[in-house]
Amino acid sequence: DLVFYCPKCTAERQTACPKL
């Protein structure tokens, strides 16, 4: 899956953000 962890998301709820 083309998904990466954004610093902002990992800092808030540790969720994967969709790769733009």
Curated annotation (Swiss-Prot):
GO terms for cellular component: extracellular region. Its main location: secreted. It comes from the Eukaryota. Induction: Up-regulated by growth hormone treatment and down-regulated by fasting. N-glycosylated. It is found in: Secreted. Residues 2-20 form the IGFBP N-terminal domain. Disulfide bonds: none annotated. GO terms for molecular function: insulin-like growth factor binding. Keywords: Glycoprotein, Growth factor binding, Growth regulation, Secreted. The C-terminus is required for IGF-binding and growth inhibition. Binds IGF2 more than IGF1. Inhibits IGF-mediated growth and developmental rates. IGF-binding proteins prolong the half-life of the IGFs and have been shown to either inhibit or stimulate the growth promoting effects of the IGFs on cell culture. They alter the interaction of IGFs with their cell surface receptors. This is Insulin-like growth factor-binding protein 2. The gene is igfbp2.
